[in-house]
Amino acid sequence: MVWLVAMTPRQSSLCGLAAHGLWFLGLVLLMDATARPANHSSTRERAANREENEIMPPDHLNGVKLEMDGHLNKDFHQEVFLGKDMDGFDEDSEPRRSRRKLMVIFSKVDVNTDRRISAKEMQHWIMEKTAEHFQEAVKENKLHFRAVDPDGDGHVSWDEYKVKFLASKGHNEREIAEAIKNHEELKVDEETQEVLGNLRDRWYQADNPPADLLLTEDEFLSFLHPEHSRGMLKFMVKEIFRDLDQDGDKQLSLPEFISLPVGTVENQQGQDIDDNWVKDRKKEFEELIDSNHDGIVTMEELENYMDPMNEYNALNEAKQMIAIADENQNHHLEPEEILKYSEFFTGSKLMDYARNVHEEF
């Protein structure tokens, strides 16, 4: 099942927009502070890995709170604020141009043009940006599906996929295809065998009833992007529970959720990382995932939390994002605030001080 997202076009007065735009442009031109772009190497590495293994389900899903391995998505707020414009704020961007882009985004979120962003306005924006990520995934899936469906019959079997997957890992495609055809044992290492087992389970889960072990393009989308299917989202939650639920009671306690990853580095830098890991996950568990605040997270609660098209979650995220930068505590986001906290919203620190802006006004 693929979710279709309908979006209502935004409408506003041309005169109002012109005045509003001039005001923002004036504000941005006042800012000459030196910028320090953030390091986007992790984003680029993920893109490179995706190109190498385009038919392998990604660990990272844009606009989804948790990675497939249960880690928090560190880029989530930037993804749901910038949408397809994330690349426009990379380390090569010119700071002043980036500030202008940020103010253009501000004006789009600020639907009623009162020069401040409310939680409702931010919620609607988050939903739109999430829909953009959905549409991008659908577009990419068409290319990925063609890679595993060379005969173009609109269906891919598990064996066909397995051949393409192993070929992408450096195995001889012809030899693998011949071995599978003759029901011979594949000569792959133990790690690859384990990956294949997990992929097979996921493949069967994506095969909508009546099961025929053949995936259509839509089913293949669910296979690669479980956030597009309610059934696959449930499967993703079960996989995360399998990794985190230490006592097997099908519930997650706070200690289970904040457990440190294996291979902790025993030095000060490693300790700082560990402290941040615990702090971030504890906050996420208590404030967002555990919706009834009983100290336990059920599969249903985790599924609701991970559902990128959950409007209630989007509103909570909107409030949280505003609270990060809301220095005057008016429950709205203002231009000076979003510029001062630009690193949170865009990944780039576009100005070193906001005090000068205030003094100019």
Curated annotation (Swiss-Prot):
Gene Ontology MF annotations: calcium ion binding
Binding site for Ca(2+) 4: D245, D247, D249, Q251, E256
Gene3D superfamilies referenced in this protein's UniProt entry, alphabetically: EF-hand
Glycosylation sites: N39
Binding-site positions, Ca(2+) 1: D110, N112, D114, R116, E121
In-chain residues carrying the UniProt-annotated modification Phosphothreonine: T192, T216, T264, T298
Binding site for Ca(2+) 6: D326, N328, N330, H332, E337
Sequence segments annotated as region (Necessary for intracellular retention in Golgi apparatus lumen): 308-361
Ranges for domain EF-hand: 97-132, 136-171, 196-231, 232-267, 277-312, 313-348
UniProt keyword Phosphoprotein, yes or no: yes
Signal peptide: 1-35
Listed GO CC annotations: Golgi lumen; late endosome
Any one Gene Ontology BP term: response to ethanol
UniProt keywords, alphabetically: Calcium, Glycoprotein, Golgi apparatus, Metal-binding, Phosphoprotein, Repeat, Signal
Record keyword Signal present: yes
Ligand binding (Ca(2+) 3): D212, E219
Modified residues (Phosphoserine): S98
Main location: Golgi
Function of the protein: May regulate calcium-dependent activities in the endoplasmic reticulum lumen or post-ER compartment.
Stated family: Belongs to the CREC family.
Domain topic, free-text comment: Binds calcium, probably via its EF-hands.
Protein name, per record: 45 kDa calcium-binding protein
Organism whose genome encodes this protein: Mus musculus
